[in-house]
Amino acid sequence: MPIIDVQVHPFDRNHPGRPWASPSHGLDSATGEEMVAAMNSVGVDGAIMVSSFSAYEYDPSYALEVYNTYPDKFRVVTPVDATDPAIDDVVAKWAARQGARGIRIRMRNGLPMDADHPGLNRAFAAAAKHGLPVNLLCWGILDKGLPHIQIGRAHV
């Protein structure tokens, strides 16, 4: 049975060609090459990359670059802005991309924290329409109004 890491965050070093949106609180990089070497060293067959919001915000281009280099190792989840009025189109375009496997919604730091926010409902509906799972970052507010959503809570 293949061993899959379900959440890794790829990012290149901070440089003018690919500047970070905010500083890293740890590694200088977690490139595709570094990830593949680490995965191979411990017998991990593949991974789901969640594009690094702290490095690139809503731009998944680095994760897609890694996917294009190692399509046999990775699939990609991208952060989406649930407040974007065009969220339906954003999710539809993402779903059509080679390697796309899900979306990530962040409910923190100035973004919708209310489970009843209409953008969240639109994002969930768009993901469901296109068969994409949702990776939900919602520290401290997980159960406040989304009883109909099946949520995996483990993060190890």
Regions inferred by a protein language model and the residue ranges of each:
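An N-terminally biased module of ancient metal coordination in phosphate/nucleic-acid-related enzymes
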Residues: 1-58
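Active-site gating/metal-coordination segments in enzymes
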Residues: 54-142, 147
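Conserved small/polar residues in nucleotide/adenosyl-binding loops
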Residues: 154-156
